[in-house]
Amino acid sequence: MQLFPAIDLRGGQVVRLTQGDYDRMTVYGQDPCAQARSFVAAGAKNLHVVDLDGAKDGTLSNYDTIAALAKQGGLYIEVGGGIRTEERIEKYLSLGVGRCILGSVAVTDFAFTARMLQKYGDKIAVGVDAKDGYVAIHGWKEVSAEPGVAFCKRLAEAGCTAIIYTDIACDGTMQGTNLSLYRQLAAQVPGVAFTASGGISSEAELLELQQMGTAAAILGKSLYTGALDLARCVQLVQD
């Protein structure tokens, strides 16, 4: 199982939100590149980057920071937040970003998403955020009428091979992740590599996710608060 330590960017700073709430934001650092280097030093090979400003208002205000992160070397980087056009996808891929994550646009413009999946293949992942089992969009402010699992099946039929699935109730809470949900996704949507995201806060959870065949896990607040040690986690999933 791959591990993706997370860097969420707001105004060029490293931050974490609780349950996607911009009013419940904690700043953890002023230097995202230094943070990335510390992840590499702990053995990380991947990095999950979210442009929170882009997600909120579609701006590119963190573009230079993401460009600098992409130049770090030794890291496979996935980027999400405000990616709603092919031009933006091209812009990030040209930096050397490994894959772009489509979020709300996958719900609001499924035809566009299907086209991008066909054109760019594994350079595109889809981020599915679910609230009480239903897909949420636009910074989790709106909840659609479509169940998350059904939406994942539709994405798979459109050629999607990688889905980052977040249970909003768990995200940033440090209360543990929704293990039964990932078990259900693995059983009902075969052929898709799922990344677990939201609330992972123990080594036991990582091992359970790995045993059920989860492709990757995103670690955020658990690393910043010291609840999990990244070097130990990397060893754990490699052994």
Which residues fall in each region the model found?
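Conserved, mostly hydrophobic/aromatic
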Residues: 8, 39, 47, 92, ...
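Conserved beta-strand positions in the central sheet of alpha/beta enzyme cores
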Residues: 48-51, 78, 101-102, 125, ...
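Conserved anion-binding
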Residues: 11, 19-23, 90, 97-171
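Glycine/small-residue-rich loop that forms an oxyanion/phosphate-binding "nest" at active or ligand-binding sites
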Residues: 53, 58-118
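Catalytic cores of alpha/beta
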Residues: 73, 77-99, 180-216
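Charged helix-capping and loop-helix junction motifs
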Residues: 60-67, 141-150, 175-184
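Glycine-rich phosphate-binding active-site loops on the catalytic face of alpha/beta enzymes
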Residues: 83, 94-112, 167-170, 198-202, ...
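Glycine-rich, proline-tolerant flexible connector loops at the mouths of alpha/beta enzymes
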Residues: 46-64, 104, 165-175
